[in-house]
Regions:
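Patatin-like phospholipase
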Residues: 1-42, 50-256
Length: 256
């Protein structure tokens, strides 16, 4: 079956280190010159998608595997002096500028649109942001999209407090449809049939006290994610999307 890529969107789920699966898929797309006019990514999917949109094959894999092995950029030690479980200085300053420079010009000149999903802490709703001119804003959006709740500081974009987009929209296929792409390729990082435990999550009273709507969506994120998974499987069965996912459970933690 030949795909009409001119009218298809690309949706990239997050998932932290499970995103190495996405890296392989995107490198395959680049090897075969498969390009989409529109893409949208969440958290790790946003970061990996940026390298795809700048046509830098292997860059996302390097950041997820090689750079992790060399620099060990995830750990409790970073909470001490960066207030984050991730070495955000390495990831969003040193890596894109020095270790494996991001090709901003190639990204800017790519006619395809690319949106990244964040969660607005004030409203508890998803924000869909894109940037093709301002390097600092682009990095801020990517950082916000990947700022895990509880273990990463809030990131400000356009003066608004933001956290990981996966809190409210982990698989933003409906956003792609709203943007005019009725058919989509959806790259997932969980096997078909996976569901999260829907135990009630009680957000400690002393956390995010300034953001009551954020607290509400954090308490419901498992239910919302499971609803999205059910929708994705239904749309796949109906032939409305092409889902690319691991065949078996990925045995790796989100931040392992």
């Amino acid at each position: 079956m030949k795909l009409d890529l001119k009218n298809m969107g690309l949706v990239l789920e997050g998932g932290g280190m499970r995103g190495v699966f996405t890296c392989g898929v995107l490198d395959y797309f680049m090897d075969h010159h498969i390009e989409f006019p529109y893409g949208i990514g969440v958290s790790a999917g946003a970061c990996n998608g940026l390298s795809y949109m700048s046509h830098q094959r292997g860059r996302a894999k390097y950041s997820n595997i090689d750079m992790m092995a060399k620099y060990h950029y995830i750990g409790l030690k970073y909470l001490w002096y960066q207030h984050s479980i991730l070495d955000q200085k390495l990831l969003y300053e040193i890596f894109p500028e020095e270790l494996l420079p991001y090709d901003y010009q190639a990204y800017y000149e790519n006619p395809a649109r690319f949106e990244m999903v964040t969660t607005n802490c004030m409203t508890g709703r998803a924000c869909y942001l894109e940037e093709k001119k301002d390097k600092e804003r682009l990095l801020a959006i990517a950082k916000a999209s990947s700022s895990l709740p509880y273990v990463c500081p809030i990131t400000y974009v356009d003066g608004r407090p933001m956290l990981d987009g996966g809190i409210v929209d982990s698989i933003p296929v409906l956003r792609a449809i709203e943007q005019g792409y009725e058919r989509n390729v959806v790259v997932l990082t969980r096997n078909r049939g996976y569901r999260k435990s829907e135990k009630d999550i009680r957000v400690p009273r002393f956390i995010y006290t300034r953001y009551p709507r954020l607290r509400v969506v954090l308490s419901r994120r498992c239910q919302v994610y499971n609803q999205q998974l059910e929708m994705i499987e239904r749309m796949e069965d109906e032939g409305r999307i092409i889902a690319i996912r691991p065949e078996q459970r990925v045995v790796v933690n989100r931040i392992e």
